[in-house]
């Protein structure tokens, strides 16, 4: 019955704020909505954000490690390349020296062969010259004997 009397009484005209059950009801609604949003939205979104941040930090750490490894490998390969170039350069120098030595040796052999052939030719020519002189001397002696014989016979 008291409820009925209150319902019939109407709303009293108050001042700036009316102190009735609306304000605490709104406060309870705000608190319930906060808990509900926290449970249904903010926690899952926060978890996703934290997972994403963890993934990003892990990915960045892995990328830094891989970058450091790549830089080490690059330095090692550069050192190996430098060593290989030096080795190739020394092989080239050795080959050039060997070719130069072989060239000089072949040139010396060719000069020796040419000198030997020249000396043999000179000896052969000298022998032929001496042979020709001997033949000529023999013919000269024969001709001179023939001339003397003819002169004396005449």
Swiss-Prot record:
A Pfam match: ATP-synt_B
Major localisation: membrane
Gene Ontology MF, one: proton-transporting ATP synthase activity, rotational mechanism
Classification via Gene3D superfamilies: F1F0 ATP synthase subunit B, membrane domain
Keyword entries, A-Z: ATP synthesis, CF(0), Hydrogen ion transport, Ion transport, Membrane, Thylakoid, Transmembrane, Transmembrane helix, Transport
Membrane topology reported for the UniProt record: Single-pass membrane protein
Family: Belongs to the ATPase B chain family.
Protein name as annotated: ATP synthase subunit b'
Gene that encodes it: atpF2
